[in-house]
Curated annotation (Swiss-Prot):
It is an enzyme of class 4 (lyase). Its main location: cytoplasm. It catalyses: a (3R)-hydroxyacyl-[ACP] = a (2E)-enoyl-[ACP] + H2O. Keywords: Cytoplasm, Lipid A biosynthesis, Lipid biosynthesis, Lipid metabolism, Lyase. The active site is at residue 54. This is 3-hydroxyacyl-[acyl-carrier-protein] dehydratase FabZ. The gene is fabZ. Its EC number is 4.2.1.59. InterPro entries: FabA_FabZ (IPR013114), FabZ (IPR010084), HotDog_dom_sf (IPR029069). Involved in unsaturated fatty acids biosynthesis. Catalyzes the dehydration of short chain beta-hydroxyacyl-ACPs and long chain saturated and unsaturated beta-hydroxyacyl-ACPs. Transmembrane segments: none annotated.
């Protein structure tokens, strides 16, 4: 249930993103403006499955998952701005530049992701992203995401097993 037009709760996030446990990394959207920016939360819990091995005795939220959380935030912004995915359409991470990690994120942290549209061209959208904990920057990156229907070819069994016929 939405309390205002700029906040999204988990039910609405689940309606927009295909990700599910343990890979859904956005817990709530705090604010957004279509076509401009989005601010979201990831509550980092010791119960996350990757903390068993990253690292035993010194749990650290993996940097690649900070980037994934920001990428999921771009997906929510894109879907709220341009509409949901159509059947067969995909939204995927297409590139990353200038990723910088400033400090570790640990269990108990509440990570705020802020993403902004930079530009869109030929099916690719460029975003900037910043992740913060307690107002302190933990990660910055420029990300590219793509939205498209993958090319598919349908070949029947008879076409595959048909003997080559040479014309004379």
């Amino acid at each position: 249930m939405t309390t205002d037009t700029h906040t999204l709760h988990i039910e609405e996030i689940l309606d927009l993103l295909p990700h599910r446990f343990p890979f859904l990394l956005v817990d709530r959207v705090l604010d957004f403006e279509e076509g401009k920016f989005l601010r979201a939360v990831k509550n980092v819990s010791f119960n996350e499955p990757f903390f068993q091995g990253h690292f035993p005795g010194k749990p650290i939220f993996p940097g690649v998952l900070i980037l994934e959380a920001m990428a999921q935030a771009t997906g929510i912004l894109a879907f709220k701005s341009r509409g949901k995915l159509e059947p067969g359409e995909l939204y995927y991470f297409a590139g990353i530049d200038e990723a910088r990690f400033k400090r570790p994120v640990v269990p108990g942290d509440q990570m705020i992701m802020e993403v902004e549209f930079v530009k869109e061209r030929r099916g690719l959208t460029r975003f900037t992203g910043v992740a913060k904990v307690d107002g302190e920057i933990v990660c910055t990156a420029t990300m590219m995401c793509a939205r498209s229907k993958p090319a598919t070819a349908v070949v029947t069994k008879s076409e595959v097993t048909k003997p080559d016929v040479k014309e004379s």
